[in-house]
Amino acid sequence: MKLLEQRIQEDGVMEGEDVLKVDSFLNHQMDVKLFQEMGKEFLRLYKDCGVTKILTIEASGIGIACVAAQFFDCPVIFAKKNKTKNIAGDVYTSKVESFTHGKVYDIIVAKQFLLPEDRVLIIDDFLANGSALQGLITLVRDAGATLVGAGIAVEKAFQPGGDLIRGMGVRVESLAKIKSMSVENGVEFC
């Protein structure tokens, strides 16, 4: 998606060789008009899949998922990283390692919201090593729901996550795929 690639070129900030900060428009301050265009693109890619739920993980995927859900006319579920008092009853759980934070989390979704008849589209802001996506896929499969695919804002194609998830037979559509990035040369797209 050229619009997202252009925004990354203009406003993304490199920190080291593998960290791209896009917090001015994607995952801290959010450009809702950009999200609307991203949501339209996800709909174009997955419109014939019968999506009934969008699943993401807290926190950075929530904004993109909510805007996209308007176009699919479906609810959003976000996996929580900690069990809280307001999640009662049975839950699906999975472990994920955060690339950004270097921590392992148990992610949780209440069983009442993720049903076997659901057709689920996973949406997230980044795909790097694939751990978050693997954890979300586990939740969908544990629920007996149908996974229609994953919509990713930014994929670091030079890291193993995309190949790993596609190798599991999951359809992955990334709006911006980064071939390489460095402080010296900036970001190069696939």
Predicted regions span which residues?
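Conserved acidic residues
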Residues: T52, D118, V148
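Short, glycine/charge-rich flexible loops or terminal/linker lids adjacent to PRPP-binding catalytic cores
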Residues: C74-V120, V187-F189
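PRPP-dependent phosphoribosyltransferase catalytic core
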Residues: Q6, D18, I137-C190
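Short glycine-rich phosphate-binding loop at a beta-alpha junction
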Residues: V51-E58
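Short Gly/Thr/Asp-enriched flexible loops that form oxyanion-binding sites at enzyme active sites
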Residues: G63-F72
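Active-site-facing substrate-recognition patch
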Residues: M1-V51
